[in-house]
């Protein structure tokens, strides 16, 4: 049996992080099918983000190398954590870093990899946010004042799993990136 502290890759965990780590340990001990997959998994931090309607979303940040391990059990893990934390939607995101754009005055030792650019990180956040659903299309709508709203079209086969979470996805993406976004699930009327 592992301690809840071992599930957190942070020096000073918050109360919420300890509660979620305790829920991880309880799930690991209670369900034998999740035990093998959950044992090596750890998370870095958790942010609680307000969503419209008095709900909250828990954005759980995990290290990028262990994201694939979380994806294996994400649907079961999300369902169980949402049972434990009522009125909160659970979202798993990889902890990614954006390197600043090189300027003329700053001397770069190495070339900035594509995966560390702002665009690449924001696209990956979007993919992590809606996992296991696939993004089938993107549109950018330009408003009169110069603002942009990104419209993301999601796969309609997963409508029951994510339909109630679309507002949470919008709030989390807006809070993390500062970009306006609208999620839509196109209907299959051809």
Curated annotation (Swiss-Prot):
Biological process terms in GO annotation: cytoplasmic translation; ribosomal small subunit biogenesis; ribosome biogenesis; rRNA processing
Keywords tagged on the record: Acetylation, Cytoplasm, Isopeptide bond, Nucleus, Ribonucleoprotein, Ribosomal protein, Ribosome biogenesis, rRNA processing, Ubl conjugation
Processing and modification events after translation: N-terminally acetylated by acetyltransferase NatA.
Claim: Ribonucleoprotein is one of the keywords in the record: yes
Chain positions with N-acetylserine modification: 2
GO cellular component, one term: nucleoplasm
Cross-link type Glycyl lysine isopeptide (Lys-Gly) (interchain with G-Cter in ubiquitin), residue numbers: 83-84, 124
Entry superkingdom: Eukaryota
InterPro entries reported for this sequence: Ribosomal_eS7 (IPR000554), Ribosomal_eS7_CS (IPR047861)
UniProt-listed Pfam families: Ribosomal_S7e (PF01251)
Main location group: cytoplasm
Presence of keyword Nucleus: yes
GO terms assigned for molecular function: structural constituent of ribosome
Compartments where found: Cytoplasm; Nucleus, Nucleolus
Subunit structure: Component of the small ribosomal subunit (SSU). Mature yeast ribosomes consist of a small (40S) and a large (60S) subunit. The 40S small subunit contains 1 molecule of ribosomal RNA (18S rRNA) and 33 different proteins (encoded by 57 genes). The large 60S subunit contains 3 rRNA molecules (25S, 5.8S and 5S rRNA) and 46 different proteins (encoded by 81 genes). Interacts with snoRNA U3. uS11 interacts with MPP10. Component of the ribosomal small subunit (SSU) processome composed of at least 40 protein subunits and snoRNA U3.
Function, in words: Component of the ribosome, a large ribonucleoprotein complex responsible for the synthesis of proteins in the cell. The small ribosomal subunit (SSU) binds messenger RNAs (mRNAs) and translates the encoded message by selecting cognate aminoacyl-transfer RNA (tRNA) molecules. The large subunit (LSU) contains the ribosomal catalytic site termed the peptidyl transferase center (PTC), which catalyzes the formation of peptide bonds, thereby polymerizing the amino acids delivered by tRNAs into a polypeptide chain.
Other known facts: Present with 41000 molecules/cell in log phase SD medium. There are 2 genes for eS7 in yeast.
Family: Belongs to the eukaryotic ribosomal protein eS7 family.
UniProt-recorded name of the protein: Small ribosomal subunit protein eS7A
Gene name tied to this protein: RPS7A
